[in-house]
Amino acid sequence: MNLTFLIPTRIETEDRLRNIISSVTYLLKHTDAKVIVKEVAPHNTFLFRGLSEVKKRVDTSNLTSLYEESNDPLFCKSKVLNDLIIESDTKFVANYDADCILPVESYHQAYYALDSGQADVVYPYQCGVYQWKANYNMEIYNSFMNTLSTNVLDKEKQLSNSTIGWTQFINRQKYIDCYMMNENFVSWGCEDDEFYFRMSTLGNRIARVNNYVYHLEHSRTHNSWFSNPNFNNNYHLWNTIKTFDRQQLMDYY
């Protein structure tokens, strides 16, 4: 695969640590793509507590782990994704939420849609009610890590809505040409909406894979919920941008 998974992270809780260990291991097991993790946080938790767990189970020669020390309480996912886009060197990239797991075939179908020239952006799940919210306690975590199979996640799951978050597969040059991520969206909220709107408005062909996405459930901090102190700013920015036509959007960027 001429593909790199871009995983921005700040590991603020034990369940988020389990989730990134799980998703990175799963990606390395089931694809031959590159994976780059960039942690921006006061401490390099992934390197010192996560990486060894991944190495117990899979070859990590395709994995790169980056770290930037930061005491800023707000995690700017958009900025970290932009850093990762520049760091990558493959024809295609995938923004990837560390709490996201897909059926194995979905990765390959999304990649094929890009590689065959059918699409510029692929959402590897359907829009509607195609999210499995998977309970991910220690017992399920241990079972999943031993099998690396979504069958384990099917034991305790709840159907929920799915729209535009989690992960997107993208032609890297198109991504750059369309201004990458908007770093004015700080911490959590509305950045995924704006990205979809912009890629569509600028003429990219957007496709979907007809399947589900699993979300490994976790506790929420201000960096992953409406309690983000910058959420209102993000919301107002999105409400402004979504009124733009193509030329106004290009002028803005």
Please annotate each region the language model reported.
Residues 71-87:
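Glycine-rich, basic loop-to-helix element that forms the pyrophosphate-binding segment
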Residues 2-6, 34, 194:
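Cell-envelope/extracellular polymer assembly enzymes that use nucleotide-activated donors
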Residues 88-91, 180:
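Active-site acidic short loop of glycosyltransferases
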Residues 91-101:
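Short beta-strand-to-loop acidic/aromatic patch adjacent to the donor-nucleotide binding site
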Residues 1-26:
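N-proximal low-complexity "stem/linker" segments adjacent to membrane-targeting elements
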Residues 16-19, 162, 184-253:
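C-terminal catalytic/acceptor-binding lobe
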Residues 103-183:
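Conserved catalytic core of nucleotide-sugar-dependent glycosyltransferases
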Residues 26-69:
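Acidic donor-binding segment of Leloir-type glycosyltransferases
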